[in-house]
Curated annotation (Swiss-Prot):
Biological pathway: Lipid metabolism; glycerolipid metabolism
Role played: Diacylglycerol kinase that converts diacylglycerol/DAG into phosphatidic acid/phosphatidate/PA and regulates the respective levels of these two bioactive lipids. Thereby, acts as a central switch between the signaling pathways activated by these second messengers with different cellular targets and opposite effects in numerous biological processes. Within the adrenocorticotropic hormone signaling pathway, produces phosphatidic acid which in turn activates NR5A1 and subsequent steroidogenic gene transcription.
GO CC annotation terms, alphabetical: cytoskeleton; cytosol; endosome; glutamatergic synapse; nuclear matrix; nuclear speck; nucleolus; plasma membrane
Protein known as: Diacylglycerol kinase theta
Domain called Ras-associating: residue spans: 387-486
Region called Disordered, residue ranges: 1-50, 905-934
Biased composition, class Basic residues, residue ranges: 905-916
Native organism taxonomy: Eukaryota, Metazoa, Chordata, Craniata, Vertebrata
Activity regulation (record text): Activated by phosphatidylserine.
Species this chain originates from: Mus musculus (Mouse)
Record's comment on post-translational modification: Phosphorylated by PRKCE and PRKCH in vitro.
A molecular function GO annotation: zinc ion binding
Entry-linked SUPFAM superfamilies: Cysteine-rich domain, NAD kinase/diacylglycerol kinase-like, Ubiquitin-like
UniProt gene name: Dgkq
Reaction catalysed by this enzyme: a 1,2-diacyl-sn-glycerol + ATP = a 1,2-diacyl-sn-glycero-3-phosphate + ADP + H(+); a 1-O-alkyl-sn-glycerol + ATP = a 1-O-alkyl-sn-glycero-3-phosphate + ADP + H(+); 1-O-alkyl-2-acyl-sn-glycerol + ATP = 1-O-alkyl-2-acyl-sn-glycero-3-phosphate + ADP + H(+); 1,2-di-(9Z-octadecenoyl)-sn-glycerol + ATP = 1,2-di-(9Z-octadecenoyl)-sn-glycero-3-phosphate + ADP + H(+)
Length: 934
């Protein structure tokens, strides 16, 4: 099967090379469109030569240091060539090599539109807007899925050319090409072809594939093979061709489970900023101080007037109407002939009641008169009526020899007549043409909307209505002819926060009572009773959207529900060598580093395989991967987060096709003892996320014991009504250590302080300082713990020395890296290992002793070693397990091994690099994450 173009693709006009922000032109779809014989010429560009698609270059005099956007070299001398529309700057010698299309024609080059997923406004240093090519000196937006950066007021003009990370039933591909994104490379990036520097911190230059990370000059990229193999991380990436999600009614934020916490909300179709606000970046020109200039407010159709969104254009007071019209079109990146439009003046009151009538008449326009002081400052761009138009029609299926065909439509043309006319041009010699329909696709940067047109819909009237709404919107609208398919909609919804321990029928009844689910289209497909969660199969898009939005505002038995949209992994299509990585990130760990890692991993991998633990926990991820035959897990968080994920893995193991996945750790917490033992370090300190993933891929698999602690409290006499109360038994899983006494008391005090003021506990250094302060307060504390507990090891009573704390350790790291057991040889005990099936029991005499252990001056008091322990608490005592403290009532604690052992990944030792060895391109050039949300 021939390779298909990457979804979201844009082609390079005039060549078979890939367009920036997209993969190569498809050998299946072809590069250029096909015009029906007899149709007139189509205006697409005002470029200097065919090598500069869409640009309007003019020679300018340089007054400050300037760099070329093609070669990124300094422009020597006083002359350069600047595009009046998109600000592309070039040497004269580079003009003929420019293949980067102008922003004005970029939407027409998108292969398959894929909307972007913009997060919160952030400050991004030394980054550039892909629309106006200017530096991001003010808060801007960044796509959470690809490396697209854009000013807030440039968002409406950004292309819908994001990565397609799943199949959506429209045009599904099995083979992907490079998905090129222009600029914002690190200054040290090197071209894969010529090995010269291709990145720049001064201008938007160079290209990078969003999937494999290969980087090159825009000219050199044409020499690379078009097919993308996903690079160094190919075995870890969940292939987009193996993920299916019918997401018609859901935004990209919903599909990728990204919380909608944007500082500036951009509603559907509301992709701009309030025109009444000051605009500092983008295509607008600020008010000139010269008396010979004037600044005009330019609106684009009814939509921008309704939202009061305008662009500022500064022109000479002696400018002709044609010049003003060209400036207005440039402000909105409109590349059509200015003669097809007119400017209509708006009343000074701003009321648009005379819209379409007031302002410039045809007679006034023909006079060539210039705007004067009496001319209104607010104008709206209007399209002149047309008796016919050239319309591009795109095929809605693969294996077509052309990308589109162009036909002429007039007042008699309808959707049905257009379908019948273009089918033979696409090679579809079918008798039943009624099976095909015409689909209108609006390709905004944040949402791609598809509308099926009625058979009798007049196409010319439809285009007129679009232009009345927004002239720019015409360039973002396409028409596809596609076969009518009765595809049954199916959406999987994860609903968590339900009461645990119920039956499938009970959960179904509970949801029907809480959200009035429709039994005809909603069914419970999976039940996770222990976690109080279900998976709903919904066969109606409208019902799925209603349930999703309603569940987020619904509480059951006082607990709020969690709702997530989950795709389906087509596990039978996974390549044999594919072992995708399931990533869990706790954004609350490590300050803001967790959120930075979330964004980085979404871009390095498929965002469907990256889960935020504060949004549903680990269960949705394990359910998504339940049919994957082989996968690994990366947990980004502290030891408590690791324990959370391992506990969820234990509970869902029987549902997994891969019941024993190996687990790696990226430590973000305070202690990170398990991360230290497995060589992942004392804590994440800003390493390159790509290097982290490579280390996970190269890590060694090891086994680790896990332990089950049964807490069974004694009967408690109630003093109020003389009723005997019994605390129910509780089971806790342990990975690292369990402390009883003084160390648990310190941990409890720290935990309570963090709950009172969580905002202060965002750095590892501050957290350790609080531990020290709490410890100093307990330095004179004496409890005589050995008199308050009893210990049995392997059913044998063990006499305890005089201690204040008793600690059971599973790994050779305690309290942020201290060796509590010690390294001295002792014939009474075996050398500890994390997979030996034994726990070591150690005592400490107080806070001073603990401090000496932390400083490496002493070790703990070795008491016992075994696999089965019984501890009797004679009074209420502080207890902690893996950093989670509480006060345990008098009773029994039984500690025993959990089967089976868990598979962990230990970071491989770094091998010395040979001199002159080539490093992986992605490792060399991937930029570190940056940009802090406001």
């Amino acid at each position: 099967m021939a390779a298909a173009a990457e979804p979201g693709a844009r082609t390079w006009p005039g060549s078979g090379s890939p367009r920036l922000g997209s993969p190569a032109g498809s050998p299946v779809l072809g590069i250029s469109g096909r015009t029906r014989p007899g149709s007139g010429p189509e205006r697409t560009s005002r470029a200097i030569g065919s090598a500069a698609p869409g640009h309007s270059f003019r020679k300018v005099t340089l007054t400050k240091p300037t760099f070329c956007h093609l070669c990124s070299d300094f422009i020597w001398g006083l002359a350069g060539f600047l595009c009046d529309v998109c600000n592309f700057m070039s040497h004269e010698k580079c003009l003929k090599q420019v293949k980067t299309p102008c922003t004005s024609i970029a939407p027409s080059l998108v292969r398959v539109p894929v909307a972007h997923c913009f997060g919160s406004l952030g400050l991004y240093k030394r980054k550039f807007c892909v629309v106006c090519r200017k530096s991001l000196e003010v808060p801007a937006f960044r796509c959470e899925v690809c490396e697209l950066h854009v000013h807030p007021d440039c968002v409406p003009f950004a292309c819908s050319d994001c990565r397609q990370c799943h199949q959506d039933g429209q045009q599904d591909y099995d083979t992907y090409h490079h998905h090129w994104r222009e600029g914002n490379l690190p200054s040290g990036a090197r071209c894969e072809v010529c090995r010269k520097t291709c990145g720049s911190s001064d201008v938007l230059a160079g290209v990078r594939c969003e999937w494999c990370g290969v980087q090159a000059h825009s000219v050199c990229s044409t020499a690379l093979a078009p097919e993308c193999t996903f690079g160094r991380l190919r075995s870890m990436v969940l292939p987009p061709s193996c993920v299916r999600l019918l997401s018609r009614n859901f935004s990209k934020m919903h599909c990728f489970r990204i919380p909608e916490t944007m500082v500036l909300e951009l509603g559907d179709g509301d992709d701009g900023v309030d025109g009444s606000a000051a605009i500092g970046t983008g295509r607008e020109v600020l008010t000139a101080t010269e008396s010979t200039k004037q600044t005009l407010k330019i609106f684009d159709g009814n939509d921008s007037m309704r939202k009061n969104q305008f662009r500022l254009v500064t022109v000479s007071r002696l400018a002709r109407n044609e010049e003003v019209m060209e400036a207005a079109l440039r402000a909105y990146y409109i590349s059509e002939d200015p003669k097809d439009f007119q400017l209509q003046a708006l009343p000074l009151s701003g009321n648009a009641q005379a819209l379409g009538k007031a302002g410039t008449t045809e007679e006034e326009a023909s006079k060539g008169s210039c705007p004067r002081d009496s001319v209104p400052e607010a104008w709206v761009i209007r399209s002149l009526p047309r008796t016919q138009e050239i319309l591009k029609i795109y095929p809605g299926w693969l294996k077509v020899g052309v990308a589109y065909v162009s036909i002429r439509v007039n007042s008699q043309s309808t959707a049905r007549s257009v379908v019948q006319e273009v089918l033979p041009l696409f090679g579809q010699q079918v008798e039943d043409k009624e099976r095909f329909q015409l689909i209108e696709v609006l390709m905004s940067s944040r949402q791609v909307q598809r509308t099926v047109l009625a058979d009798e819909e007049p196409l010319l009237d439809r285009l007129w209505d679009i232009r009345q709404t927004s002239v720019r919107q015409v360039s973002q609208t396409r028409f596809y002819v596609a076969e009518t398919r009765a595809t049954a909609p199916r959406v999987s919804l994860f609903v968590g926060g339900l009461p645990p321990g119920l039956s499938p029928q009970d959960y179904s009844n509970l949801l029907h009572e809480a959200m009035a689910t429709k039994a005809a289209v909603v069914s419970v497909s999976h039940v996770y009773s222990l976690q109080g969660a279900v998976i709903l199969d919904v066969t109606c898009f409208a019902e799925a959207e209603r349930l999703y939005m309603l569940a987020r505002d619904t509480a059951v038995h006082g607990r709020p529900l969690t709702a997530l949209v989950l795709p389906d992994v087509l596990h039978t299509k996974l390549p044999p060598d594919c072992c995708p990585l399931l990533v869990f990130v706790n954004p609350k760990s490590g300050g803001l580093k967790g959120r930075e890692l979330l964004c980085s991993f979404r871009k390095l991998l498929n965002p469907h395989q990256v889960f935020e633990l504060t949004n549903g926990g680990p269960l949705p991820g394990f359910h998504l991967f339940s049919q994957v035959p082989s996968f690994r897990v990366l947990v980004c968080g502290g030891d408590g987060t690791v324990g959370w994920v391992l506990a969820a893995l234990e509970e869902t193991r029987r549902h997994l096709a891969c019941p024993e996945p190996s687990v790696a750790i990226l430590p973000l917490g305070t202690g990170n003892d398990l991360g230290r033992v497995l060589r992942w370090g004392a804590g994440y300190s800003g390493e390159d996320p790509f290097s982290v993933l490579v280390s996970v891929d190269e890590a060694d698999a090891v086994l680790m014991d896990r332990w089950t602690i049964l807490l069974d409290a004694h009967e408690i006499d109630s003093t109020e009504n003389n009723v005997v109360e019994t605390e129910p038994p509780k089971i806790v899983q342990m990975n690292n250590y369990c402390g009883i006494g003084i160390d648990a008391e310190l941990s409890l005090d720290f935990h309570q302080a963090r709950e009172e003021e969580p905002g202060k506990f965002t750095s590892r250094f501050h957290n350790k300082g609080v531990y020290v302060r709490v410890g100093l307060q307990k330095i004179s504390h004496s409890r005589s713990l050995h008199k308050e507990i009893r210990l049995q090891v392997e059913q044998q009573e063990v006499e305890l020395p005089s201690i204040e704390g008793l600690i059971f350790i599973n790994i050779p790291s305690w309290g942020s890296g201290a060796d509590l057991w010690g390294s001295d040889n002792d014939s009474r005990f075996e050398k500890p290992r994390i997979d030996d099936g034994l726990l070591e029991v150690v005592g400490v005499t107080g806070v001073v002793h603990m401090g000496q252990v932390q400083g490496g001056l002493r070790s703990g008091i070795r008491i016992a070693q075994g696999s089965y322990f019984r501890v009797t608490l004679l009074k209420a005592t502080p207890v902690q397990v893996d950093g989670e403290p509480w006060v345990q009532a008098p009773g029994h604690m039984i500690i025993s091994a959990t089967a089976p052992k868990v598979h962990m990944l230990r970071k491989a030792k770094q091998k010395p690099r040979k001199a002159g060895a080539n490093r992986d391109t992605r490792v060399d050039t991937l930029p570190a994450p940056e940009g802090n949300p406001l």
